[in-house]
Amino acid sequence: MVVMNKTNLLLLILSLFLAINLSSAQLRGDFYAGTCPNVEQIVRNAVQKKIQQTFTTIPATLRLYFHDCFVNGCDASVMIASTNTNKAEKDHEDNLSLAGDGFDTVIKAKEAVDAVPNCRNKVSCADILTMATRDVVNLAGGPQYAVELGRRDGLSSSASSVTGKLPKPTFDLNQLNALFAENGLSPNDMIALSGAHTLGFAHCTKVFNRLYNFNKTNNVDPTINKDYVTELKASCPQNIDPRVAINMDPNTPRQFDNVYYKNLQQGKGLFTSDQVLFTDSRSKPTVDLWANNGQLFNQAFISSMIKLGRVGVKTGSNGNIRRDCGAFN
């Protein structure tokens, strides 16, 4: 009987592995070649137009993608609006700080795609978000890369499903590695994807603990560069409006580059979960490598983004193509 149980367990693990890989295998770069051949250019044009209106488009879209993929996979479930009978993912406390410009980027790109008669209701919101994310990275000076397409939009979205699925600013390396592993991502993927913090901003309240109440021994986190502490305290005094935000990268906040890793070498990681990548000996060599070689970082980032885009993919009857990205059909 024990042998049977072990066998059944192995078969279950194997079936789950095959199911995940089967979904990923159905993704391909030319998925819309026969239905909406110009979809990537249509989306890129919409993204460019949105960026011209506000730079926030770039970090907001990138962050939206991560938050979508880490909760039940890359299925645009984070786009769904809550109703009287359902509190959706976007209204979980961990998602309330997602900037509206990220959502608006997808909505505007969807409108542009659907304005082309043969493309209308043929392209999923999940794929539009994937393409838009690639585009904001590239338009911020980051690498251009081919995306895999063919995702369907998710059929459910609940705030309760978000709990415990997203990394916290206070996470240590073990917690980060464990959370990424749940999504089939390696420690190297985690370090590469953390490099997205080269763009964007965070609310002051997210770093108060490092500046004013770190632990019983030190009010200030001793791993923070002293000059950076002075800078952060000037930008984030204790009585500041909690809505005030600061740049994740104090040096090149509007440029996708490897300066994030150089900042870590200097003790200028904004979150504990950033700085730990340098202070922990297991991840430090990778930080040093990418700080010294931006091309290697770009290559690693592309590889990890493609892997991220395969997480929890819905294909076929497991999803659909939403007419409105913010509501189920």
Curated annotation (Swiss-Prot):
Binding site residues for Ca(2+) 1: D68, V71, G73, D75, S77
Cysteine pairings via disulfide bonds: C36-C119, C69-C74, C125-C325, C204-C236
EC nos: 1.11.1.7
Gene3D superfamilies for this protein: 1.10.520.10, Peroxidase, domain 2 (1.10.420.10)
Domain of life: Eukaryota
Keyword Secreted on entry: yes
Cofactor(s) recorded in Swiss-Prot or TrEMBL: heme b; Ca(2+)
Residues annotated as binding Ca(2+) 2: T198, D249, T252, D257
InterPro entries: Haem_peroxidase, Haem_peroxidase_sf, Peroxidase_pln, Peroxidases_heam-ligand_BS, Secretory_peroxidase
Signal peptide (UniProt feature, chain positions): 1-25
Group of enzyme by EC: oxidoreductase
Residues the entry annotates as binding substrate: P167
Glycosylation sites: N215
Marked site positions, Transition state stabilizer: R63
An example Gene Ontology biological process: hydrogen peroxide catabolic process
Main localization category: secreted
The UniProt record lists the keyword Calcium: yes
Active-site residues annotated for this sequence: H67
GO cellular component, one term: extracellular region
Binding residues for heme b: H197
Any one Pfam family match given in the protein's UniProt record, by short name: peroxidase
Keywords: Calcium, Disulfide bond, Glycoprotein, Heme, Hydrogen peroxide, Iron, Metal-binding, Oxidoreductase, Peroxidase, Secreted, Signal
CC cofactor note: Binds 1 heme b (iron(II)-protoporphyrin IX) group per subunit. Binds 2 calcium ions per subunit.
Protein name: Peroxidase 51
Organism taxonomic ancestry: Eukaryota, Viridiplantae, Streptophyta, Embryophyta, Tracheophyta
